[in-house]
């Protein structure tokens, strides 16, 4: 956008990988890979976009976290730490930039029908769905619609928040 002459006004941090393993078996590379992609890259991209947003006195920064960043999940200490870190990062950043017309929010999806969940066997899917009061996986379009809302003018008074889109998992 900036190369085309328009400043960046909306940033969605949605990169995310997993390298699941029990902590006692987790390799340093598995930890580092997940933190580098899920947290450090988001920080670097956010920092690169902030100057233009500050100058324009407007911006929307939306980070995609996960229910796992709030609840934890066995075998995903690295992923949970990275997604919880995104929530803390976003709250701190929201406090820094709110007076400049920039909102910073987080979406914490539950289990969404994606290639990551497609690899689960029927037993694993059944176990997941048992933790979702709505009894189904979410759809990518539901996360996209939430992102569009947080980027909109109508969400201009929402900052520092985490919006849970998880079929009710956060209430359990």
Predicted regions and their residues:
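Active-site loop immediately N-terminal to the catalytic Tyr-X3-Lys motif
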Residues: 21-24, 71-77, 99-100, 135, ...
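Substrate-binding pocket helix/loop in short-chain dehydrogenase/reductase
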Residues: 22-23, 30-35, 117, 128
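Active-site helix of classical SDR
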Residues: 46, 82, 90
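Alpha-helical segment proximal to the catalytic Tyr-Lys
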Residues: 51, 95-99, 156
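Residue(s) in the substrate-gating loop at a strand-loop-helix junction
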Residues: 66
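Short, small/polar-rich loop/turn modules that mediate ligand/substrate recognition or access, typified
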Residues: 98, 103, 158-160, 166
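A conserved structural motif in NAD(P)-dependent oxidoreductases
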Residues: 132-143, 154
């Amino acid at each position: 956008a900036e190369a085309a002459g328009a400043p960046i006004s909306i940033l969605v941090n949605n990169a995310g990988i997993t390298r699941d393993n029990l902590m006692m078996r987790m390799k340093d590379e598995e930890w580092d890979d997940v933190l580098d992609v899920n947290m450090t890259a988001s920080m670097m991209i956010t920092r690169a976009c902030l100057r233009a947003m500050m100058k324009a006195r407007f911006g929307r920064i939306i980070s995609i976290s996960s229910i796992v960043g709030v609840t934890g999940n066995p075998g995903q200490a690295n992923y949970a730490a990275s997604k919880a870190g995104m929530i803390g990062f976003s709250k701190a950043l929201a406090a820094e930039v709110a007076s400049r017309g920039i909102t910073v929010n987080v979406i914490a999806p539950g289990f969404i029908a994606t290639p990551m969940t497609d690899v689960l066997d029927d037993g694993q899917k059944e176990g997941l769905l048992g933790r979702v009061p709505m009894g189904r996986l979410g759809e990518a379009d539901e996360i996209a619609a939430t992102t569009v809302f947080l980027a909109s003018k109508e969400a201009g008074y929402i900052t520092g928040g985490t919006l849970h889109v998880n079929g009710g998992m956060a209430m359990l």
